[in-house]
Design a protein with these regions (language model features):
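Short loop/turn motifs at secondary-structure junctions and domain boundaries
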Residues: 2-5, 47, 65-66, 83
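Short, Lys/Arg- and Gly-enriched loop/turn segments at beta-strand edges
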Residues: 94, 107-119
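Short acidic, Pro/Gly- and aromatic-enriched capping/linker segments at domain boundaries
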Residues: 1-14
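Glycine- and acidic-residue-biased ligand/ion/polar-headgroup-sensing regions
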Residues: 70-88
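A short glycine-rich, His/Asp/Glu-containing loop-to-beta-strand
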Residues: 16-66, 72, 126-127, 132
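Short acidic-glycine-tyrosine-enriched beta hairpin
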Residues: 88-106
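A short hydrophobic beta-strand segment most commonly corresponding to one strand
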Residues: 101, 114-139
Length: 147
């Protein structure tokens, strides 16, 4: 095992003065912990919140027009690819193992009526996503709150 603490990248969908944006962030406050019967492993406790866990399958060609995440939520593609487009015009495509944290609650509709983000599948296979939806509301304003 290396002595260097790992870093895990994620995309953060956040709100800046009513406009959704995406920032590439890093989780990097890992500490070595042990659990009975296992070798040491790296942990970064991202908070303690009640959460719901869901598995969703987005069919080929699926598009979720402009909407906000209902609650702050981690989204991890397990297979297939999907995209997230924010109000600032940025579009990010993600595949298996890439991580997004959706926290765009509180957007203000723009001149075209866009509010929050669009998302959808990419390619010719469904996107299987795991969602971990936090019961707590949005965290502090700004990107990268788990950095």
């Amino acid at each position: 095992m290396t002595d260097a603490s790992p870093v895990v990248a994620y995309w953060h969908v956040w709100v800046d003065r009513g406009v959704s944006r995406q920032a590439r962030c890093r989780i990097g406050r890992f500490v070595l912990k042990t659990i009975p019967g296992a070798s040491p492993q790296w942990w970064d406790d991202l908070g303690t919140s009640r959460a719901g866990v869901s598995m969703i399958v987005l069919p080929v060609g699926w598009v979720g027009e402009w909407h906000e995440n209902p609650k702050p939520q981690w989204i991890v593609p397990l297979s297939g690819r999907w995209f997230v487009e924010t109000m600032d015009g940025e579009r990010v495509e993600m595949g298996p193992g890439e991580i997004s944290f959706g926290e765009d609650q509180g957007c203000v509709p723009d001149a075209h009526g866009h509010k929050g983000h669009r998302s959808g599948t990419v390619g010719e296979e469904p996107a299987v996503l795991m969602l971990v939806q936090l019961e707590d509301g949005a965290g502090p304003a700004g990107p990268c709150r788990f950095a």
